[in-house]
Regions:
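Structural signature of tandem-repeat unit edges
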Residues: 1-3, 13-26, 36-49, 59-72, ...
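A structural signal for leucine-rich repeat
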Residues: 190-194
Length: 202
């Protein structure tokens, strides 16, 4: 077996754990969509792509490690995984898809690697437990509503590499205390930020 097909285990509500064999290179769209009891999944180093909505709605999934072999994560891949507390994003990934982690209300920390150049629309929308995020120097664009509704987010660092921030990227971040940014980048992006929260880098 080299792939897990689209919708393969959709709605298998009693499935608690899954170990994907080393022969698999791709996980299809909606492959484990709404496997409500799924608590753990082991993704082998052979996997290079995770499809759209692959684990969407897996509300019992608590942690996931995405191996370095993965180069693409589909839109909504982990959307509404409301028990997901941590995720390891590999250095091989270049973009975080639209709504990839939307509604992951238990997600507390996320490390975005230096390989990522874009953060998609609604990527972390409604991650209400997320407290801090550091955006690496590789990122050039942050999508619309990317961190909207992250009500526990206290600080964010925006590097000079960012050339565009979408509408409402940080709207509803009611706990936000500081946006760490250079003067130059702020002048370019100030229309999309909170002036009262700005802390300038040297």
């Amino acid at each position: 077996m080299t792939s897990i097909g689209n919708n393969a285990f959709w709605g298998c509500s009693s499935l608690q754990s899954v170990t994907i064999p080393d022969s698999v290179t791709s996980i299809g769209d909606d492959a484990f969509h709404e496997c409500l009891s799924l608590q753990s999944v082991t993704i082998p180093d052979s996997v290079t792509s995770i499809g759209d909505s692959a684990f969407s709605g897996c509300s019992s999934l608590q942690s996931v490690t995405i191996p370095d072999s993965v180069t693409s994560i589909g839109d909504r891949a982990f959307k509404d995984c409301s028990s997901l507390q941590s995720v390891a994003i590999p250095d091989s990934l270049t973009s975080i898809g639209d709504r990839a982690f939307q509604g992951c209300s238990s997600l507390q920390t996320v490390a975005i690697p230096d390989s990522v150049t874009s953060i998609g629309d609604d990527a972390f929308y409604g991650c209400s437990s997320l407290q801090s995020v550091t955006i690496p120097d590789s990122v050039t664009s942050i999508g619309d509503s990317a961190f909207m509704g992250c009500s526990s987010l206290q600080s964010v660092t925006i590097p000079d590499s960012v050339t565009s921030i979408g509408n409402k990227s940080f709207a509803g971040c009611k706990s936000l205390q500081s946006v760490i940014i250079s003067h130059q980048t702020y002048d370019r992006l100030k229309a999309k930020l909170y002036p009262s929260k700005i802390k300038f880098t040297e």
